[in-house]
UniProtKB/Swiss-Prot annotation:
GO terms for molecular function: histone deacetylase activity, NAD-dependent; NAD+ binding; zinc ion binding. CDD domains: SIRT4 (cd01409). Its cofactor is Zn(2+). Keywords: Cytoplasm, Metal-binding, NAD, Transferase, Zinc. Coiled coil: none annotated. InterPro entries: DHS-like_NAD/FAD-binding_dom, NAD-dep_sirtuin_deacylases, Sirtuin, Sirtuin_cat_small_dom_sf, Sirtuin_class_II, Ssirtuin_cat_dom. The active site is at 119 (proton acceptor). It is found in: Cytoplasm. This is NAD-dependent protein deacetylase 1. HAMAP family: Sirtuin_ClassII. Zn(2+) binds at residues 127, 130, 181, 184. It catalyses: N(6)-acetyl-L-lysyl-[protein] + NAD(+) + H2O = 2''-O-acetyl-ADP-D-ribose + nicotinamide + L-lysyl-[protein]. GO terms for cellular component: cytoplasm.
Amino acid sequence: MTVGRAESPELVAVLAGRRIAVLTGAGISTDSGIPDYRGPESPPSNPMTIRQFTGDPAFRQRYWARNHVGWRHMDDTLPNAGHRALAALEDAAVVTGVITQNVDLLHTKAGSRNVIDLHGSYARVICLGCGDTTSRAALAERLEALNPGFIERTEAIGGLAVAPDADAVVAETASFRYVDCARCAGMLKPDIVYFGESVPKDVVAAAYRLIDESDTLLVAGSSLTVFSGYRFVRHAAARGIPIAIVNRGDTRGDHLATVKVDGGCSELLALLADELSPLPTH
């Protein structure tokens, strides 16, 4: 059943009185100013693959130059009404937790406590050699020391576009100097699951567990194009629990949905926060 965006009684009816596991994608963050790779109005985008990153020093140089600018914009981004609604529903014991395909940390910023960052976080960096992790802010200090004035020169041009993985469009990257791991001189990479990488098994297991402990699955702002998210819809369907999808445009999981609402996440999640009654916490 598909209902128009202005109607939501069916959505509320499917979710009312149930403990809800939530799966979110890029569509929930567009109202915070972060673009969607695959939304119906998104421009063509070619996200980086892990093979490109590890196999080509020039590609890494270009990537780190762009990320050096882009991560700050991601860090300054604020959650929107959709993120805040899910945090409020968790406080009301309605939402059991959020599985997010986003790396923007906006659920955590909004106050959600049980968040599974399926694809990692823009705010951490990991060494592919020794596995050491550090904050992106600490790496920024090292990069700034090697590239004084780079950010100012880039932002002076104006019209900066930042992708969902904190990759900014920067024209001049050939002079940028990047660094290796301070501990072992290994290759550093943002702690983000890139195209061609697998989500860590323990993270996948935690997401399955969250769905198993819930009475229904709500998908918000994901086209479910990649299997890393779609598998959880299949898992919920195999368990026989209701599935509700809120998204602008079609999704890969529409045929499995109990109810699908074509509309924006901010408005519809805020509506759910108003309509769904708190549940007992025992």
